[in-house]
Amino acid sequence: MHTGTTLTQFIIEDQRHIAGASGDFTALLNDIVTAIKTISNAVNKGALIGVMGALDTENVQGETQKKLDVITNEIMIRHNEWAGHLAGMASEEMDDVYLIPNRYPLGKYLLVFDPLDGSSNVDINISVGTIFSILRAPVPGQAASMEDFLQPGTKQVCAGYALYGSSTMLVLTTGHGVNGFTLDRDIGEFVLTHPGMKIPADTREFAINASNQRFWEEPVQRYVSECLAGSTGPRNRDFNMRWVASMVAEVHRILTRGGIFMYPRDTKDPSKPGRLRLMYEASPMSFIVEQAGGLSTTGYERILDISPENLHQRVPVILGSKNEVEVVLGYHKA
C-alpha cells in the first residue's frame, strides 16, 4: 500500500499558503475527484454494466453521443451541483449553461468540463479521460449566465484531467506547476506519484492526424514533411509519429516524455477554424502544458489569451515541447 501524500493533503497544504482561503476550492475539488472516481469505475466496467456503444442522439457539436458520454456528463453534474460551491456549469455535451437547481445554494466558482474526452475509443478499450477547468464567478452567489463563462484561459483558477488507462491518474495545476496523482484503489484515494511534472524542451515525437494532410496550411505541411524526412532532411534527426485520437492520452504522453501535439487549422471544413473546443479542451490543456514548461498556440496566437466568443468555440491547437512548438510558430511567421 502506498503511504505517500494524498490529493486532499496536497490541496489543503497548498491552500494554507493562500491568504483568505476559505476551503471552498478544496471542497469543490473533492467533489470533482469523487465524480472522477465514479467515472473511472463506469469506464473500467464497460460492457459488464452495458454502457458501451452509441446512442441515436447527437451533442451540440453534431457528434453521435456514446452511452458513456451521457452517463459521465450526468455523473459530473450530480456530484457537483449540490454543495454550494458553484454558480453554474458548462459541458461539451450540453448546448447551454447548466443552472444550479433552486434547491441548492450558489457559490463563487464556475465549472467547465469535457466528461469523456476520446469517447470514440471506448469500444476498443483505448485510454480516455475527463478534462475540467475552474473559473471564478464574476458575481459570487448569483446564477451564472453564458457571458460569465467567456473568460480567457489566463483566468483559470485550476485545470486538470483524469486519464482512465492501465491506472487512473489525475493531473492538476492551480497555477503553481503540475502534479500527477494515481488512484490507489486499496484506499480509494489519489496519491501523489508524479510531483513537479515538466515537459522536456526537445523531442523527437509528433502527434497529428495524417489523414488530413491535404487540408493543412503550408507551415504545418512543411513541419511534418521535415520531420518525416528525418536524418536525411533539414532537421538532421529522425522523428516518430503518434496518434491516439484522445487528447488526454496525447497530452499525458507529452507531459511524461515530451512531444508535440497538433490539431491545426485546415480547409477540410471552412466553417470551422479548428477542431478542438476552446473552453473544454484547448484552454485547460494549455494551462497545464504551460505550467509544465511547454508552449501552446493556434499557430497565430497564444491559446490562453483567447477570450471565447461562445460556449462551443473551436480553435486550432499546437502544444507541447517548447523548442518544437517554436519551430512550428516560426514557420507560421515566415
Curated annotation (Swiss-Prot):
Subcellular locations according to the entry: Cytoplasm
Keyword Hydrolase: yes
Residues given in the record as Mg(2+) 1 binding sites: 92, 114, 116
Gene3D superfamilies xrefs: 3.40.190.80, Fructose-1,6-Bisphosphatase, subunit A, domain 1
Example GO molecular function: fructose 1,6-bisphosphate 1-phosphatase activity
BP terms from Gene Ontology: fructose 1,6-bisphosphate metabolic process; fructose 6-phosphate metabolic process; fructose metabolic process; gluconeogenesis; sucrose biosynthetic process
Chief location bin: cytoplasm
Any single Gene Ontology cellular-component annotation: cytosol
Pathway in which this enzyme or protein is active: Carbohydrate biosynthesis; gluconeogenesis
Catalytic activity, EC: 3.1.3.11
Assembly description: Homotetramer.
Similarity comment: Belongs to the FBPase class 1 family.
Protein name in the entry: Fructose-1,6-bisphosphatase class 1
Species this protein is from: Nitrosomonas eutropha (strain DSM 101675 / C91 / Nm57)
Classification lineage: Bacteria, Pseudomonadati, Pseudomonadota, Betaproteobacteria, Nitrosomonadales
